[in-house]
Structures are given as structure tokens and as C-alpha cells.
């Protein structure tokens, strides 16, 4: 399975912070926001990754992430000049995807919790249909809302309904089979002129091929798209890391523990981080 990180948009809700920098490059406590979505793909075992962003922001992402080989990954890059919908990612990435199944994750979504790596690895084994997650929220009318039966089969999905049929929202991570590009190309723009991810999911739903996996109460899902939620996400990460003494969404550590890089390669990475606490933490992994 291949992975796509969608890190486009103008981040208008975060102005003036995002007037000169991509939202997904802003810090969430001690690391760039993009590290959190990247880490989810890595935990799923996905090593070939396409990052899609604006022409203005791509150079900064390239400088930060490089070709991915330092983490045992392979990065590609593509432009989305204007925000024309999440589902456009599959059209932009058609050549990258080829005939492989694909996971799309939004660059401003942060996940953490018990059992999450196993759920991601299981989802990455998908060969037919599509799989989305369901997360209970108190304000489902703000999200794409999904209804499903006890077997995890989707029954209905709506985008920001006035009267939600459930309190389960669909977070910004989606798994699709190799037919996703063809289906995305058949989508019609919505009233706001975008190719909607909910409409793509509806195509799989209509074919009886949309599965739902619940994220349990032990999983946190944070959307760092506003000043308030960005601060909350940073405070959450700091609290967990200070309490546990372990980092959340550290690509170097994940690459090492997943066997993508060895101890010699990890030690080489620590030299570029100087005397920062981040670098000191990585050195403890080699002790």
C-alpha cells in the first residue's frame, strides 16, 4: 500500500501564523505538525509516500523531509495549486498510485492512543473496497457523519448534516483499493466546486464496499486547524510526553523500531539535531 499526505490549503483559520508558512509546518509542541500524519503512515507499514501541497510551500517540505531515505522511506512530491477538494489528491497522485491500494491522510490531523498501530496495520492490508474510521464526537454536525451496523458495514454517510444520524464522525485518514483513481475521476464537483471525499466514500457505499472501523475511547483525534486547537494539541502532546517519558509521532524512533533503519543510521540522524531535547531523546534509544 502507498500513502498520500494532503498538506495543501491556505490555512486561513490560522492567519496571521500561516501567511508565510504552511499550516502543516507549524510546531505542535516539539515537532512540525506534518510529523504526526507521517507517523501514522509509518506505523501502518507504508513506506512509499506522496506529499501534496501548494507550489509555494513544497520547497519547505522538501527541505524538511528530503527524499525520505533518512527514515527508510521514499518520498515523492506533487502540487495542488488550488484547494479543489480532498478527493482530487487521487487524481493528482494517479501516476504515483498506479495499481496499488492507497491511504490518504490529512496533514493537520493528529492521532494517538492505545491499539492504534494495530488498527492501522490491519487497515493497510486492504485489497478490496474502502475502509474509514468512526470517532465519537459531541458535535457531529461539523463533520462527515457515518452510520454503520454491528459488523462494521456502512449504512449511510453525510457531510455536515443538520440532523446527524449518529454521533460518529469520519476522521481524516482513509484507506482505498486500487480502483480509487478511476472512481475519483468520475466524481462531479460539489456546490462549492470541490471533489468531496464524502462523495467518493458514497461510491464505495453504493457498491456495498465501504467498511467502518471504530476508534475506541482510548484514542485521541485532534484537528489542529485553529489557534485554539493548535494550542490544545501542543498541550496534549506535552502532557503525554512529560508523563510517559516517550515521544509521540517521532519519525526517527518509529523508523528504528519498525526496522526501516538500523542503529548506525539512527545515530547519524542524532548528529544533525545537536543538543536539542529531541536529539537527546533519540540518543537514549541507542543506550
Identify the meaning behind each predicted range.
Residues 113-141:
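Conserved donor-nucleotide/metal-binding helix-loop-beta segment in metal-dependent transferases, i.e.
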Residues 252-258:
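Charged/polar low-complexity intrinsically disordered segments, enriched in acidic residues
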Residues 25, 146-148:
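A structural signal for short hydrophobic beta-strand segments in well-ordered beta-sheet cores
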Residues 260-261, 266-287:
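Short, amphipathic C-terminal "tail helix"
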Residues 9, 108, 136:
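Active-site glycine-centered loops adjacent to acidic/histidine catalytic or metal-binding residues
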Residues 14, 61-65, 184, 233, ...:
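Hydrophobic packing residues within well-ordered alpha-helices of enzyme cores
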Residues 103, 117, 121-124, 153-252, ...:
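Catalytic-core segments of class I nucleotidyltransferases/pyrophosphorylases
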Residues 2-5, 13-16, 26-27, 31-106, ...:
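Conserved N-terminal catalytic core of the sugar/cofactor nucleotidyltransferase
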Amino acid at each position: 500500500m502507498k500513502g498520500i499526505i494532503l498538506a495543501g490549503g491556505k490555512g486561513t483559520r490560522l492567519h496571521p501564523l500561516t501567511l508565510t508558512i504552511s499550516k502543516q509546518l507549524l510546531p505542535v509542541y516539539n515537532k512540525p505538525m506534518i510529523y504526526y500524519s507521517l507517523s501514522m503512515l509509518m506505523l501502518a507499514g507504508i513506506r512509499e509516500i506522496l506529499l501534496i501541497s501548494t507550489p509555494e510551500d513544497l520547497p519547505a517540505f522538501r527541505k524538511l523531509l528530503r527524499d525520505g531515505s533518512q527514515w527508510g522511506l521514499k518520498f515523492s512530491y506533487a502540487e495542488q495549486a488550488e484547494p479543489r477538494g480532498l478527493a482530487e489528491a487521487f487524481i493528482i497522485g494517479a501516476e504515483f498510485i498506479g495499481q496499488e491500494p492507497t491511504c490518504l491522510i490529512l496533514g493537520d490531523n493528529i492521532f494517538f492512543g492505545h491499539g492504534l498501530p494495530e488498527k492501522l496495520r490491519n487497515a493497510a492490508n486492504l485489497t478490496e473496497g474502502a475502509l474509514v474510521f468512526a470517532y465519537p464526537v459531541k458535535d457531529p454536525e461539523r463533520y462527515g457523519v457515518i452510520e454503520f451496523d454491528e459488523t462494521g458495514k456502512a449504512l449511510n454517510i453525510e457531510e455536515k448534516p443538520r440532523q446527524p444520524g449518529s454521533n460518529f464522525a469520519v476522521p481524516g485518514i482513509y484507506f482505498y483499493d486500487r480502483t480509487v483513481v478511476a472512481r475519483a475521476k468520475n466524481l462531479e464537483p460539489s456546490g462549492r466546486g470541490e471533489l468531496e471525499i464524502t462523495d467518493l466514500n458514497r461510491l464505495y457505499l453504493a457498491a456495498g464496499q465501504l467498511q467502518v472501523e471504530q476508534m475506541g475511547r482510548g484514542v485521541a483525534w485532534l484537528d489542529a486547524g485553529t489557534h485554539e486547537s493548535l494550542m490544545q494539541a501542543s498541550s496534549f502532546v506535552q502532557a503525554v510526553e512529560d508523563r510517559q517519558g516517550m515521544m509521540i509521532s517521532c519519525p526517527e524512533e518509529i523508523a528504528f523500531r519498525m526496522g526501516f533503519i538500523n542503529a548506525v543510521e539512527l545515530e547519524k540522524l542524532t548528529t544533525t539535531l545537536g543538543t536539542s531535547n529531541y536529539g537527546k531523546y533519540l540518543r537514549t534509544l541507542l543506550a
